[in-house]
């Protein structure tokens, strides 16, 4: 015996998704990807910049020690007590850490994201009354009451604007102008 619905010529509904439903799902995934991918790429670049800042720790200590021992900022890496070759301080995304008249210069290599590859970021030492040496990252504000260390780029106690070549959107808040 046949089923009554089939006998009358009724159509059967197929199970599964229609083409329209699948296209809607693909469109939603595309929209989410368009939002998520740039945010993730920005996060990756910021992490690479952070590596560069972290690599400055040892050099900052050496510049401070040299300043307190000699009364002026070291002109070179060797004067700061570091190896003379800037590429000796390198990492996965950083090709060199240099000392240029007391100012630390991080250069990002070509393993880094294309947005920062080949660019630099600077840290400038300042002396403040009561707190010793503080560091100015890139184009951030000069520390309150801070005067540049004797012997740093710009000479004497003048404030110098040392702009990083890394776009500010990738810098930590402490490094932004």
Q: Which positions does each model-derived feature cover?
A:
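N-terminal leader/signal peptides at the extreme start of proteins
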Residues: 1-20
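Internal alpha-helical transmembrane segments of multi-pass membrane proteins, especially GPCRs
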Residues: 20-24, 45
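Alpha-helical hydrophobic helix detector
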Residues: 23-36
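Amphipathic alpha-helical protein-protein interaction surfaces
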Residues: 28, 45-48, 102
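Membrane-proximal N-terminal amphipathic helix
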Residues: 45-74
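Periplasmic/extracellular, small/polar-rich flexible segments of pilin-like filament-forming proteins
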Residues: 68-177
């Amino acid at each position: 015996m046949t089923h009554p619905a089939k006998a009358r010529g009724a159509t059967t509904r197929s199970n599964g998704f229609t083409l329209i439903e699948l296209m809607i799902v693909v469109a939603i995934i595309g929209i989410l990807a368009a939002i998520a991918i740039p945010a993730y790429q920005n996060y990756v670049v910021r992490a690479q910049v952070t590596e560069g800042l972290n690599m400055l720790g040892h050099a900052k200590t050496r510049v401070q020690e040299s300043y307190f021992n000699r009364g002026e900022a070291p002109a070179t890496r060797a004067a700061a007590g570091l190896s003379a070759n800037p590429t000796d301080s390198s990492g996965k995304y950083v090709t060199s850490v240099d000392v240029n008249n007391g100012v630390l210069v991080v250069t990002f290599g070509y393993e880094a994201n294309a947005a920062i590859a080949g660019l630099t970021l600077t840290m400038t030492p300042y002396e403040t009354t009561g707190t010793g040496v503080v560091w100015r990252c890139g184009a951030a504000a000069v520390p309150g009451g801070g005067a540049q260390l004797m012997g740093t780029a710009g000479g004497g106690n003048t404030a110098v604007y040392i702009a990083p070549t890394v776009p500010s959107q990738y810098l930590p808040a402490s490094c932004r102008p």
